[in-house]
């Protein structure tokens, strides 16, 4: 399989040896290139997911979805982006201006930072540390501040109630989310994200397969907790339109609102990407131990495997959103603290026992 690190090594050698640039300029140019790549991927993924959401929603509601602007309505998203870019940005008179303008950037930083840890091909990752799983949970937690500060700084009673709901929900479900990731770390023996994928290469070696029942349960709990962490339906209580107008971002307009809108979809992609990376092998192809089949699967580029698995999980989460009704706040917290949290602890114990006695693939 193609190793993307060859490309990054070539660029580094081009800057340092061929062009003769010093360390500072080389690193600066490389950082700029990485930033451009991240923002470009961020925008493209958000556009694709918004269009996909509209079509999936229409499918489940027996409609066609956007069809007017361009073929199959593919340019509708671009029209909406243009409208959002030119809208006026304003704040209410009694808002805390510093926190009001800071909050959307915190949400973007959290989503982009977490997105940077995803390895979408062999050797293709922006950040890769030996404590990657720990850093993913830490960076993603910054988004809670963005949600809470948006409601608090807006000086709007509906926004404050929404922010309280969103914060308590996100903090609660981070517990189950983290325990499921720890279960994967116990099985693979590493916290490095690229190492987790490498541990899943080989025949029938995806974690959800070799981890047996505990891994399957951890995957399902992770999807539920991740959906709640991203404030997606049926856990979108923080944005309950019939109760709280638009939720914690009621007082935002233009790109202030746009940042929250984009972050929601990137968080959806990040949760799906982490699920596919940790439990479904990430960029690792499906190998079953039959040489001819395995050789054929290995011909498919790693990024196709990664994006294919990720968008399959995205579709599943969209299916859940447009099928189930919104839960109440007491139901959401009861689901986490009375069911998912104890189940996550049991899964972790089961996984530890399986690894200790060698009962895994």
Region annotations inferred by a language model:
Residues 2-361:
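Selective transmembrane helix interface/packing segments
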């Amino acid at each position: 399989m193609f190793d993307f690190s060859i490309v990054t090594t070539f660029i580094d050698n081009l800057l340092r040896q061929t062009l003769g640039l010093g360390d500072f300029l080389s690193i600066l140019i490389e950082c700029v290139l990485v930033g451009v790549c991240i923002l470009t991927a961020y925008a493209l993924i958000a556009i694709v997911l918004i269009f996909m959401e509209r079509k999936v929603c229409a499918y489940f509601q027996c409609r066609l979805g956007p069809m007017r602007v361009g073929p199959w309505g593919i340019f509708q998203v671009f029209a909406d982006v243009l409208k959002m870019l030119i809208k006026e940005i304003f704040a209410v008179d009694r808002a805390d201006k510093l926190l009001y303008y800071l909050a959307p950037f915190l949400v973007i930083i959290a989503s982009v930072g977490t997105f940077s840890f995803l390895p979408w091909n062999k050797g293709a990752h922006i950040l890769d540390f030996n404590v990657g799983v720990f850093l993913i949970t830490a960076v993603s937690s910054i988004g809670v501040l963005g949600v809470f500060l948006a409601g608090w700084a807006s000086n709007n009673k509906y926004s404050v109630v929404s922010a309280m709901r969103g914060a308590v929900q996100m903090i609660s479900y981070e517990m189950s989310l983290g325990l499921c990731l720890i279960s994967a770390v116990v099985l693979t023996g590493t916290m490095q994200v690229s190492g987790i994928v490498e541990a899943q290469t080989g025949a029938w070696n995806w974690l959800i397969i070799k981890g047996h029942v505990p891994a399957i349960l951890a995957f399902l709990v992770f999807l539920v907790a991740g959906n709640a962490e991203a404030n997606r339906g049926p856990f979108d209580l923080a944005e309950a339109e019939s109760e709280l107008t638009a939720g914690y971002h009621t007082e935002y307009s233009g790109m202030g609102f746009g940042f929250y809108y984009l972050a929601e979809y990137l968080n959806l992609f990040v949760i799906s990407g982490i699920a596919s990376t940790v439990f479904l092998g990430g960029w690792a192809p499906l190998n079953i131990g039959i040489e001819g089949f395995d050789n054929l699967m290995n011909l498919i580029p790693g990024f196709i495997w990664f994006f294919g698995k990720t968008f399959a999980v995205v579709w599943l989460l969209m299916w859940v959103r447009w099928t189930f009704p919104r839960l109440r706040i007491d139901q959401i917290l009861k689901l986490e603290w009375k069911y998912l949290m104890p189940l996550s602890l049991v899964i972790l114990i089961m996984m530890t026992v399986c690894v200790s006695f060698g009962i895994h693939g």
